Design a protein with these regions (language model features):
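Conserved short histidine dyad/triad with adjacent acidic residue
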Residues: 1, 146-154, 165-180, 217-218
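A short beta-strand-loop-beta hairpin characteristic of the jelly-roll/cupin
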Residues: 1-29, 33-37, 180, 184-207, ...
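An N-terminus-focused feature that recognizes amino-terminal "leader" regions
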Residues: 1-23, 141-148, 234-236, 269-273
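A short hydrophobic beta-strand segment most commonly corresponding to one strand
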Residues: 6-8, 32, 46-66, 187-188, ...
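Short, surface-exposed secondary-structure boundary micro-motifs
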Residues: 36, 216-217
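Contiguous mid-protein beta-loop-alpha structural module that forms a pocket-lining wall or clamp
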Residues: 36-93
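Asparagine-centered strand-capping/turn motif at beta-strand->loop junctions
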Residues: 42-43, 222-225
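A short, N-terminal "cap"/entry segment at the start of jelly-roll beta-barrel domains
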Residues: 77-162, 248, 259-274
Length: 274
């Protein structure tokens, strides 16, 4: 189908076949499915395989264009310059000094293609880098995380064009500074315990819990208890909102919000912490 997916494995092992790539995965690995890429999952391990999949299918269903094919036949790539590729592209040209331009139809139906690859973020590799963030001091005001970045999304900061996936380490006793943003977030906690405050209400969570942790524009923060660190996967529709110029973000509730991607964003005190 035309959905762009992000997947993670909750338990078990297996192989994701995405296009012409085979991706062997283990627990907590993350990978993506480019839109329209033929894909299937195989449980070639000895245990039950449980996966979480995040996709834009719901949005496409609301648009009434959610198209899915079962057992599709692989298509042959069209020959360059053939009828299917539409020939050459015409250049857009400016009509004033501010940048308003006109683009010919030949380019409208043949935009510059950018390959979309299946990518894999093994948890073992990600964790080795993530654990280094656990040593940042308590005075740090940012989040101890890495975005699983797909370079195809460029400045839109995505794992797919619609979503980002981040992995967070939360050392014992860390309480985040409250903030809010238009983008919505879903957290999957897979190690440790803690709580979240969302619009003034407290929610307790533990490893294995899945939570809509930040509805759009809801003030929220998260905290870990003192006994052990937390690992969590967050899925958020930030890239889509950046592209729509709708990503209003308030990192500090005492300061004005900003539209990320259109205006300058925020800074942390990372350089001043150890």
């Amino acid at each position: 189908g035309q959905i762009g997916d992000t997947g993670t494995i909750v338990t078990g092992t297996g192989t994701a076949h995405v296009g012409d790539r085979a991706i062997p995965f283990e627990r907590h690995d993350v990978w993506n499915h480019p839109a329209y890429a033929i894909h299937r999952h195989v449980n070639d391990g000895d245990d039950l395989q449980v996966r979480l999949t995040y996709s834009n299918a719901a949005l496409l269903e609301m648009m009434r264009v959610h198209l899915v094919e079962e057992d599709p036949v692989p298509e042959q790539a069209p020959e360059p310059g053939g009828h299917e590729t539409g020939g050459g592209r015409g250049e857009a040209f400016a009509i004033d000094e501010h940048g308003a331009s006109l683009m010919p139809y030949e380019t409208l139906i043949n935009p510059q293609p950018v390959p979309s690859k299946a990518l894999h973020w093994p948890w073992r590799t990600v964790k080795s880098h993530l654990d280094e963030l656990g040593g940042i001091g308590q005075e740090y005001v940012g989040r101890r995380l890495y975005l699983l970045y797909n370079p195809r999304t460029e400045r839109f900061n995505g794992t797919t064009p619609n979503f980002f996936a981040t992995m967070t380490i939360r050392p014992p006793g860390i309480v985040d500074r409250p903030h809010r943003h238009v983008s919505s977030a879903i957290n999957y906690y897979f190690h440790g315990t803690g709580y979240s405050r969302v619009e003034g209400r407290r929610y307790e969570w533990k490893a294995g819990d899945l939570m809509v942790s930040a509805p759009g524009w809801a003030v929220h923060n998260h905290a870990s208890y003192d006994d052990e660190q937390v690992y969590e996967l967050t899925i958020q529709d930030q890239p889509l909102n950046i592209f729509m110029e709708s990503l209003l973000w308030q990192e500090d509730l005492a300061a004005p919000p900003r539209i990320l991607g259109t205006s300058e964003g925020f800074a942390t005190n990372r350089g001043a912490t150890s």
